């Protein structure tokens, strides 16, 4: 028997043994992962993400991927000479813009991600919320534009119809369950269909949160471009409850785009998801560190 104990090899063995209780805990569970941000535009990070998803499937976890694509939609609209407008972070979406969004999300991005997973040795099925009537959407109510955009006479904020922007109203998980049971990985574009038969563009975080709740997922992961939720001194907050989030929003610790993300997390855990995690998608294999190590790698939100 060899007596050469390579420290690096021993460290790898210790990592595997540390993962054992988590492998046992999560076997057969469902994880919903919202994939977006910087990681989508970096081939190395995209490869790392695909490998992580395939590994989860290989160890008996059912990953369900929901992806975004706002920057890609913006680039395509610019190339086509179509102006982009936003209200409260939501894209004003007319019929033409909705068609472009569906083309980019359900076409280019979705199939590219399926290909990354295939290259990593997995089998993925690319779908959108329209397939099988999975996501029935309702139109998002008109929004008040920022105060800078006001009626010239009254000075009141102008109410803007966002067009074909929706949010999940009902979710049928049959298609997702069928794909998972077949040993494959669902990759879902955030597009839904309304009762009126119209196509609606849905915020990817919102879509992922609603799907996680409908599935009763063990985890919802939101991959972002920040380490997680930070306090005022920029230290990572590793464990939060809904009451903590309300307090942090009230005192200004969290603001901007982080607020709707955390609202999604709170809704998900209150509607059936066991826990949610906000973590840095720019860090290679951050999701594996969060799942399989005691220290974790992001901010965990529980009810």
UniProtKB/Swiss-Prot annotation:
NCBIfam families: argB. It is an enzyme of class 2 (transferase). It is found in: Cytoplasm. Substrate binds at residues 69-70, 91, 201. The gene is argB. It comes from the Bacteria. Keywords: Amino-acid biosynthesis, Arginine biosynthesis, ATP-binding, Cytoplasm, Kinase, Nucleotide-binding, Transferase. Its EC number is 2.7.2.8. It catalyses: N-acetyl-L-glutamate + ATP = N-acetyl-L-glutamyl 5-phosphate + ADP. One of its GO terms (cellular component) is cytoplasm. Belongs to the acetylglutamate kinase family. ArgB subfamily. Pathway: Amino-acid biosynthesis; L-arginine biosynthesis; N(2)-acetyl-L-ornithine from L-glutamate: step 2/4. This is Acetylglutamate kinase. GO terms for biological process: arginine biosynthetic process via ornithine; L-arginine biosynthetic process. Its main location: cytoplasm. GO terms for molecular function: acetylglutamate kinase activity; ATP binding. It holds the Pfam family AA_kinase. SUPFAM superfamilies: Carbamate kinase-like (SSF53633). Catalyzes the ATP-dependent phosphorylation of N-acetyl-L-glutamate. It comes from Novosphingobium aromaticivorans (strain ATCC 700278 / DSM 12444 / CCUG 56034 / CIP 105152 / NBRC 16084 / F199).
């Amino acid at each position: 028997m060899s007596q050469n104990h390579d420290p690096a090899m021993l460290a790898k063995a210790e990592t595997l043994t540390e993962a054992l209780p988590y492998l046992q805990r999560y076997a057969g569970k469902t994880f919903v992962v919202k994939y977006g941000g910087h990681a989508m535009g970096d081939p190395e990070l995209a490869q790392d993400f695909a490998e992580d998803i395939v590994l989860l499937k290989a160890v008996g976890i059912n990953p369900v991927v929901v992806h975004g694509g706002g920057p890609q939609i913006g680039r395509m609209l610019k190339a086509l000479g179509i102006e982009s407008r936003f209200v409260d972070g939501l894209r004003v979406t007319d019929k033409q813009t909705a068609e472009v969004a569906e083309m980019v999300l359900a076409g280019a991005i979705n199939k590219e991600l399926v290909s990354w997973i295939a290259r990593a040795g997995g089998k993925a099925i690319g779908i959108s919320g329209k397939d099988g009537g999975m996501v029935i959407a309702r139109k998002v109510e008109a929004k008040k534009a920022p105060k800078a955009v006001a009626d010239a006479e009254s000075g009141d904020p102008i109410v803007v119809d966002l067009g074909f922007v929706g949010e999940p109203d009902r979710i049928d998980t049959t298609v997702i369950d069928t794909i998972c049971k077949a040993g494959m990985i669902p990759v879902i574009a955030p597009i839904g269909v309304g009762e009126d038969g119209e196509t609606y563009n849905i915020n990817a975080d919102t879509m992922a949160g609603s799907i996680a709740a409908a599935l009763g997922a063990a985890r919802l992961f939101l991959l972002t471009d920040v380490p997680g939720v930070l306090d005022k001194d920029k230290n990572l907050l590793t464990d939060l409850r809904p009451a903590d989030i309300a307090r942090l929003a009230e005192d200004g610790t969290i603001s901007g785009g982080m607020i709707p993300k955390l609202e999604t997390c709170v809704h998900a855990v209150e509607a059936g998801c066991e826990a949610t995690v906000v973590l840095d998608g720019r860090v290679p294999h951050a999701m594996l560190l969060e799942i399989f190590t005691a220290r974790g790698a992001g901010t965990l939100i529980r009810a």
